[in-house]
Amino acid sequence: MRLGGVVSALAIVITLFAIWGISVNKTYLWALKENEKYEVQCKDIPRSDCSPPVLFKAHPGCCPHKICPADQYPFFIRSGVANIVGPKICFNNTIIMGEVKNNIGWGLNIVVVQGETGEILKSSYFNTHSGGLLEFLKSVQTGNKIFVASYEDPAVVLTDEIREIFAGLGSTMSRSVKRRDTWVFAGAAGIVKESPFEKLVANDEKSNVYGDWPEMREVGGCFPRKI
Ligand SMILES: *[C@@H]1O[C@H](CO)[C@@H](O)[C@H](O)[C@H]1NC(C)=O
Ligand SMILES: *[C@@H]1O[C@H](CO)[C@@H](O)[C@H](O)[C@H]1NC(C)=O
């Protein structure tokens, strides 16, 4: 009887902590979202005059400015955060896809760039409702670069054939991406080795930071024009 009481009390305490944890991160997500909106409003204002009004400055909407050698292009990819904050793909220190540009969606967000000139060839997002990812990937030509960011659930569009195409673009993790995982990847058509620019976080209810979703991930660096 007494032991039962202790166990119930423990269960209640654990549940309360779990609820508290989720609400803490709801606040964090809200702050991220507010942060993004504010960054949109002040994107043409000097950074020193423009600090977001919310709790902390977590992941600002602008691209982290990066200088690369002349034969390389800077890029930056951030995955979506849970199903709340959209992903961001920057190329040459410019946002190509993001909340700011209102051109992102659940599923996979993808930008394709002409390798040497740096021209943006196409950008789109794919989920069960939009389809078309296979045709999109088949039109990627040798030397093109590809930048991929997950949002909410990347696995919905990943057929075996599509996973293999990503593997051919340098991905070592595309075959392992599961429902609601976080995945960011930069690769190239004609790449001979594995891309170093890839991160995957598994959706695991025991370690998820956002309830049904794991932590977000970022990857960035200098991508060689020629591969
Ligand atoms: C909430 O999210 C932040 C950032 O992702 C993380 O550092 C923190 O541990 C999370 N808090 C809880 C209670 O899960
Ligand atoms: C990349 O950025 C540099 C510096 O802003 C600019 O001069 C160049 O034209 C850009 N290249 C492309 C392909 O956008």
Residue ranges and their predicted role:
Residues M1-I146, Y151-I227:
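Short acidic-hydrophobic catalytic motif
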